[in-house]
Amino acid sequence: ELLKQSDTLDMRTELGDRAMDTNDLEKERGITILAKNTAVKVGDKQINILDTPGHADFGGEVERIMGMVDGVLLVVDAFEGTMPQTRFVLKKAFEQNLTPIVVVNKVDRPGARPTEVVDEVLDLFIELGADEDQLEFPVIFASAMNGTSSLDADLATQEHTMKPIFDTVFETIPAPEDNSDEPLQFQVSLLDYNDFVGRIGIGRVFRGKIKVGDNVTVMKLDGTTQNFRVTKLFGFIGLDRVEINEAIAGDLIAVSGMEEISVGETVVEPSH
């Protein structure tokens, strides 16, 4: 719904209920297994979104994603309340000192108990050792199915807009530091493969900038280094991966040109 209501997609684009679950097993089981990333445009701003698995069985994916983001939207069912996977993901977010926003979804569901669910979330925050700032988490009440949201638990206040979520993200979650003038640091958190460009490293530019044609160095997990030339860069917008010429600190991108690259490895300038 965030994709639909942002300034990102063509109005004719048809989205299913689980637009970011593209893996066959995900579609079959109705769960997220592999982390996905996208970005939405809201006015002149951009929000990078990473959809992460919630289940502890896919913990490696969750931990890698938590290292790429500045905050989390914790989505909790207004009827079911907190689940085992809620605890798992939240614990990982707190370990990274991330800023939380709670979204109580499905408030239109029969038997929904949004106010009680917020109390459950607060209890869980306390149990997991949230600090004072994290305990002051903002709450949005929503129905993704209906495309509505509100800052009030009263169902009558729901309006057909995701603006409360967008506004809360901008107000609550810090923007990336502007350190594009520093030496490059790009960390690979996810991998992909394309028959045309080979192995692709996906991750976040933490410092500096990277351009197509740059000669860069991979700091390997075994302590060795390997040089390569950046052949292509891709950014993410909506459901598309788009070619770009340059990326700067804060961007989530995909990089090709590396024959061998592994999750957790870092790309830097050769001089550093």
What are these regions (language model features)?
Residues 1, 60-62, 84-87, 111-116, ...:
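Short acidic, glycine/serine/threonine-rich loops at helix termini
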Residues 7-35, 58, 124-137, 170-184, ...:
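Active-site phosphate-binding and catalytic loops of NTP-dependent enzymes
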Residues 1-76, 80, 120, 191-194:
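P-loop NTPase switch module centered on the Walker A-proximal segment
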Residues 185-272:
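Conserved nucleotide-binding/hydrolysis modules and their immediate coupling elements
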Residues 99, 108-174:
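Canonical P-loop GTPase G-domain recognition
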Residues 3, 55-56, 79-82, 106-112, ...:
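Conserved nucleotide-binding/hydrolysis micro-motifs of P-loop NTPases
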Residues 66, 71-134:
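Conserved C-terminal guanine-recognition region of P-loop GTPase G domains, centered on the G4
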Residues 30, 49-51, 65, 73, ...:
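Residue-level signature of catalytic and energy-coupling elements of molecular machines
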